[in-house]
Design a protein with these regions (language model features):
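N-terminal, positively charged nucleic-acid-binding surface of large information/translation enzymes
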Residues: 1-153
Length: 153
């Protein structure tokens, strides 16, 4: 069996510029990738940006610019972070790139063809700040009958 290792940072949201948490995660991931390479393991280290979602739409509206313009501006800052930190990533991927879109479509179609994706009904509450669906039992009911997540979203 080949001695291969794949590691990736989270794909960072571009609703804002990078902060210390992004740097920390990137450095930790880079450390592991470098250690694996020094140990003789064929290692692929990827990072990049997620350029979809309500957070990005809202941030673009708040800055009076188009979402893709915000993505272009902030994704460049994340790419710059990889250079400033001297990260050893093999690639930087944006979810708005054609290669990512084509790959995601290909994977989706394969999952559909295999019957791994199906229509169903789901009930829950969506938290934009957490980008997560919650069951009502997982929420905290407020005095005004609204709900909060444990993170406050």
């Amino acid at each position: 069996m080949p001695n291969n290792f794949f590691i990736t940072t989270p794909i960072y949201y571009v609703n804002d510029i990078p902060h210390i948490g992004h740097a920390y995660t990137s450095i930790a991931t880079d450390f592991i990738a470098r250690f694996k390479r020094m140990s003789g393991v064929n290692t692929i280290f990827l990072t990049g940006t997620d350029e979809h979602g309500q957070k990005i739409q809202k941030a673009a509206e708040n800055n009076s610019i188009e979402p893709l313009s915000l993505c272009d501006k902030n994704s460049a800052k994340f790419r710059e972070l990889t250079e400033v930190l001297n990260l050893s990533n093999d690639d930087f991927i944006r979810t708005t790139e054609k290669r990512h879109i084509d790959g995601a479509k290909s994977l989706w179609n394969k999952l559909m063809d295999n019957g791994d994706i199906y229509l169903d009904t789901y009930k829950g509450w969506y938290s934009v700040s957490d980008e997560t669906f919650y069951n009502e039992k997982d929420l905290i009911k407020q005095k005004d009958d609204s709900f909060k997540t444990v993170t406050g979203g």
